[in-house]
Amino acid sequence: KLNPSKGYDIYRDAIIRILNEFKEWKAFSIGDEKRNKPIIDHQNHYELGYLTHKEVLKLLNRSEIAVVPSRWEEPFGRTALESSSRGCATIISNRGGLPETTDNCIILKKLNSNELYKEIKKLKKKKKYRNKVQNDGFNNIKHLTKENSLIIDAIRESLINKFKLNFIKNKLRIVNIYNL
């Protein structure tokens, strides 16, 4: 959704400055919000509207930087997770579940357009830094959900065998699992 609760106005103000400064760069926005949407009026900005998940992933594969400056407490930052897993240098706010999705993104110290502008500009100007953020995000262990699920399953099976749990007679009532 492209609205102020998702920080779209923060993105708008920062990206207009970036596009004015770096004429060769292009910026894209994905989403279909109809109400209260800030307008980005720039020749190098493209509003793509609604895209399927597959189309979003294709665009992320071709992108260098992704921005998720949400104001509201995101329950889970899927956009940040997917952006980072596709090799984007990902900039996020410190809201809700966003910081938990990757250990290798840039977290805005202050949630405003000037701070976002500075972080995007730093990524643009410092290629080695940008490449490091991209590579570290791409290689983040949190993206390995299939592999992590196999590890958790193996631990569960070993506990069942170790404690000779019988699910018919002695059902587990409560299970609390933390990330290892």
Model-derived regions: residue spans:
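Short alpha-helical segment that forms part of, or immediately flanks, the ligand-binding pocket
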Residues: 57, 80-85, 99-100
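Short acidic/histidine- and often glycine-rich active-site loop of Leloir-type glycosyltransferases
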Residues: 95-107
